[in-house]
Amino acid sequence: MKHKRRFICRMICALALSAPLVVKAQSEQSFVLDTLHLPGTMNVVEPELLKKGVVNNALDALNGQTAGVNVTSNGLDRMAMLNSVRVRGTTSIMGGNDPLVIIDGVTSDVATLATIYPADIESFTVLKNASETALYGSRGASGVIQVKTKKGTGRGFQISYEGNCGLEAMCKSMEMLNAAEYIAAAQKLGLEYNDKGYNTNFRKAITRTGQVQNHYLAFSGGTPHSNYRASFGYIDHNTIIRSKGYRNLVAKIDVTQKAFGDRLTGDFGVFGSSFKNNDIFDNQMLFYSADAMNPTYPYDRVNGSWLKNGSASQINPPGALLVERNDTKNMNFNAHLKLSYDISKDLSVSGFGAYSYASNENDQFCPTWVWAQGNLYRGEFKSEEWLANVQANYQHVWGIHDLKAMAGAEYQKDVRSGFWTSAKGITNNDMGYHNIGVAASRPFGGTDSNYEDPSLASVMAGADYTLLGRYAVSVSVRGDGSSMVGDDHTWGFFPSLSLSWNMKREKWLRHIDDITMLKLRTGYGRSGNLGGISSYTTMNTVRQNGIVSINSSPTVTMGMIRNNNPDLKWETRSTWNIGADVGLWNNRLVMTAEYYYSKTTDMLYAYDVPVPPFAYDKLLANIGSMSNQGLEIGFSVTPVQKKDMELNINMNLAWQKNKLLSLSGEYEGMQMSAADVTAMGGLSGAGQHGGYNNVVYQIVGQPLGVFYLPHCKGLVVVGNGHYRYDIEDLDRNGTVDLSDGGDRYIAGQATPKVTLGSNVSFRYRDWYLSLQMNGAFGHKIFDGTGLAYNNMSSFPDYNVLKGAPEKNIVDQNVSDYWLENGDYLNIEYLTVGYDVPIKKGVVKSLRLSLSVNNLATITGYSGLTPMINSYVVNSTMGIDDKRTYPVYRTYSMGLSIQF
């Protein structure tokens, strides 16, 4: 393998510059287009760019690799507990913002993708333009991620192993008062305090050196006519927080068989995973308690009991909180079979079938020393999916004409069910959640179940015509019929049209050797979104409302929970894009740029309606609209390319602007509109000691998720050396009003305006170095942690940050005082490796590596970390609300060997 390590120089916006690319319908039955003729942008992330030190999650492998794709995973904002991906921004308020995931032709989701073992992934292909996603119809509005896993090569028997072991060390945490500082501050301020005689750093007490190990073993063999591949992966991660960790076991088998003179090809695959996560019941309570606990208290039990400060009702002894449990077990299974038959040189047909099963178990336990009566919860959720697809593909070249076409049909059926129960009144904490019968009471509504069985039928067709090898037009249409929309809108149709011009093949440019590629492209298409609709959204539905006595027997009463809306239909996203791709000097320098504008219409929103005439006070209707526009720029350069040395630099930049256009319109002759200003997120949970707490808002005419805050002119003395925030009377009416409609102004947005991803790879003989950097700019973060931890009105019952006693602020109302720039540049990983020279023998290649993940973050943000949830629209968006999970760095060693 000496000198043969190939550094991928793919464009992060990228074109696979020489290989053909596949435009795939939902089951990968497809027609092949030459990349240079492709009117849209398909972003391919190849295997070399997925090697990022310790990668515990396939989503982490994708982060920063392609422009306009933002990944929020548990590895970034651990307190938000998100596994989400946004492709070119948020497109809906009610849901369906995660992209459609296709794993080896099987429809899936981001949660399942997170369980795929990273080393099993051959490549990611991200589809962003509607001219590409229209083939996915009602589920393509938020983009599509195609995942291709590794298959047999047909080169005889091979064995490969990849392993990685690492340690996690805390590198940054909240600096709270120690015992001596705590006592000195209380005495200086003349406050009564409890002194138990200890000096405890509770943050260090609940943490440890984290350990992570990944092991991956793969077998493959056979011939080009009959081959197989089997792989097994295992991840064991004991996190930096005591008692928290997870394990993921993955197994996968793929078999390919050809027959009848290679005219028939059969592909069969089986995938299974088991993911077990051990967590605690209330993470925010744990971290706030560890920070705010009186440092003179002990960490361990005293005489068999936890020592608790009765005056601090919002915290508990951190050691007691670590006994809580919130455990999950996710099981996934999939089997799929694809048969393809070449009827002639130009015509082929294929059939694809898949079955998927998933189960999720969630078990929770909260002991009586945390909650007076304790709490138990057990839930089990299952889903099954059947998918069938048939397709015909035609391809013919005659003279200067090249035509590729496809037509197909698809049917998908899902069945989802769940059951859960909760109880309290625990008499014995030793059994945890394993014996729910020891609990004395079952709260009303704590036991429930659900069931839904949506189905989707589809027809699709597409064609690609190329003239003279340089002028290309591509058209497609897909029709989806869903059981979840209203009867009058069962079918939705999603067309697309795109054009491209390969200028390099023009006579006047063909002989200019310095220009390897020059292409212009544009396209328009429509795609749909069903994410905001459930199986029974179009119907009047009821649920249990209470218990009354009828004839001396307890009887459950029922009440309305939803108005029916037979006019519910798809949200529709229309996108127009125009772009250019340039390659110079044999593609040692590749540049790409694309502008896009998309508009979501018929956007779903839950409107307030009068009762009567409606039976319920909310109505879900298709009335709103939202836009996204942006510019994506990328380049890939190879400044050094020699036998013993090579340097590649890849970079992508994305500018993105979102705007909530309208939430007003008519429904059956009735004018409907949402409130001008609606709170989306605020400070909550442990550590919120009163005050106005709404921070992030939804405002028509603004980006979704803006900071709408009072303006603080500074601090003002209020007596006894205390300070409060000096809030400006913005409307000049003589009264400061902190409510949602009061003295507030739009102070910035939570979503970054610009994102950056960059990868640098360098090889010198058998040594190599790889560096990944990601960044986000142009957004704000509200430091709710700083607000809470500097609030001296709760001291000394609750500990505070170093420096807080000197500021002596006794105010917890929100304002722009705690709003900061969220810009950052993070060095995600640095890897140094060595390819051991192998001359002869059983071993074909051997690679050793050392990696550091989360090497450094350059930022002006004063909080713990700027890498919080800045993309997913929920109550945590843009808010650092006591999300004080320690920042840690991972040091790891890797081994890769092939036989």
What are these regions (language model features)?
Residues 1-259, 264-273, 318, 332-334, ...:
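Short, small/polar-rich motifs associated with maturation and membrane association
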Residues 98, 210-213, 248, 254-260, ...:
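Extracellular/periplasmic, surface-exposed regions of secreted and cell-surface proteins
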Residues 101, 300, 465, 706, ...:
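Short aromatic-centered micro-motifs
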Residues 160-195, 420-422, 621, 638-748, ...:
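Conserved small-residue
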Residues 284-319:
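Acidic, glycine-rich flexible loop segments
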Residues 734-735, 768-828:
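C-terminal beta-barrel architecture of Gram-negative outer-membrane proteins
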Residues 749-781:
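Glycine-rich, aromatic-lined ligand/substrate-binding cores of catalytic
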